[in-house]
Amino acid sequence: VMSRENKHFSGPLLLKVVQEAGLVHGEMGLFHYHLAGKDEPLFSVANILEPGRFELSEIATLQTPGLALFMRLPAVVSGEQALQILLQKSRQIAAQLSGSLCDEQRMRLTDEKLAELEHKARRYTAS
């Protein structure tokens, strides 16, 4: 999720938005999304700026141009389900931050790239 037009996301707004999306701050200073009753995160959110973590003690002054959302497969649900949840939450976060959903090259996520991600995700069944 990237900010638009070389702007930045503020820490307080970012914290509010990710918490509303159901993510919690945790291990390695990242935000994590857990399915109900599961210990292992389904996906995590990092700051695209090094070192990638979010220090809650510094969130009031944080300014970042973007967020990296990532997951490890296999997961507790199928790869397709995991990807759909990640995309739904990514879209929610992007909309609330007035950001753009982008790929790993920080280019807008195209239908072709989305189809490629879906194809890769289909290879994984729930663990």
Give each language-model segment a name:
Residues A68-S127:
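Well-ordered alpha/beta subsegment
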Residues F43-E50, T61-A75, Q88:
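Active-site-adjacent structural patch at catalytic or cofactor/ligand-binding sites
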Residues V1-I59:
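Short, highly charged
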Residues G37, L62-T64, I93:
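Short flexible coil/turn linkers enriched for glycine and charged/polar residues
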